[in-house]
């Protein structure tokens, strides 16, 4: 007598023999059609030349140009001659892309007007750079003093000094006014009162006024 129940496999009404026969008669799925894959050929000389030109253009206009904005303009990786970036390039030294001024750039003066060449200090039409003049302090001071003198002279010419003549009539009036100072008020100011006429009194009564 068997104890317990063992697990049974439900084959959907099929026996093991039928399952084995089904697997034996099954055919594999179809694969992609056969195709001859060509081997990679070597790079031709004209392709190497095109690649070198592409690298020079990309380096001059994108990587090293002062007018190109990128996320990380601090350093530029030195690439190989074929222009491809490899994983091993991370160990190569990096060069900084410093901000260059217009005078440091290799500009062609033929593409700039004459007035812009002088302003930017670029080469002139003859191909020579504009000579820089040094500032002479003595000449600068003399020029400043001369300009100040000319300014003062022009100011004096525009507003000449007019001397005012004294008024003779006013001086005569002042003299006449000084002669009239000796009047009766000056003589009577310190009068002792001898000319006043008062009644005598004993002192017990108050002053009597007429």
UniProtKB/Swiss-Prot annotation:
InterPro entries, A to Z: RNA_pol_III_Rpc31
GO cellular component assignments: cytosol; nucleus; RNA polymerase III complex
Acidic residues bias spans: 163-185, 193-210
Pfam family, one: RNA_pol_3_Rpc31
Origin: domain of life: Eukaryota
Presence of keyword Thylakoid: no
Region described as Disordered: spans on this chain: 151-210
Keywords: Cytoplasm, DNA-directed RNA polymerase, Nucleus, Phosphoprotein, Transcription
SS bonds (residue pairs): none
Compartments it resides in: Cytoplasm; Nucleus
Residues recorded with modification Phosphoserine: 103
Coiled coil: none
One term of GO molecular function: DNA-directed RNA polymerase activity
GO biological process: transcription by RNA polymerase III
Main localization (coarse): cytoplasm
Record-stated family: Belongs to the eukaryotic RPC7 RNA polymerase subunit family.
Function statement: DNA-dependent RNA polymerase catalyzes the transcription of DNA into RNA using the four ribonucleoside triphosphates as substrates. Specific peripheric component of RNA polymerase III which synthesizes small RNAs, such as 5S rRNA and tRNAs.
Quaternary structure, from the entry: Component of the RNA polymerase III (Pol III) complex.
Name the record gives this protein: DNA-directed RNA polymerase III subunit rpc31
Gene behind the chain: rpc31
């Amino acid at each position: 007598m068997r104890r317990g129940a063992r697990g049974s496999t439900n084959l959907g009404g099929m026996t093991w023999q039928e399952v084995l026969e089904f697997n034996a008669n099954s055919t594999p799925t179809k694969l992609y059609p056969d195709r001859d894959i060509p081997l990679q050929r070597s790079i031709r000389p004209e392709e190497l030349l095109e690649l070198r030109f592409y690298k020079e253009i990309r380096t001059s206009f994108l990587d090293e140009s002062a007018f190109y904005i990128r996320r990380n303009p601090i350093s530029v990786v030195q690439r190989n001659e074929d222009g491809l970036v490899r994983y091993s390039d991370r160990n190569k030294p990096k060069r900084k892309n410093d901000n260059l001024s217009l005078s440091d750039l290799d500009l062609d003066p033929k593409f700039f007007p004459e007035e812009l060449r002088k302003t930017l200090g670029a080469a002139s039409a003859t191909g020579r750079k504009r000579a820089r003049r040094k500032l002479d302090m003595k000449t600068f001071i003399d020029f400043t003093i001369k300009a100040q003198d000319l300014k003062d002279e022009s100011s004096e010419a525009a507003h000449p000094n007019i001397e005012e003549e004294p008024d003779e009539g006013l001086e005569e009036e002042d003299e006449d006014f000084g002669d009239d100072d000796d009047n009766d008020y000056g003589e009577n100011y310190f009068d002792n009162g001898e000319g006043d006429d008062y009644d005598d009194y004993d002192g017990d009564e108050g002053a009597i006024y007429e």
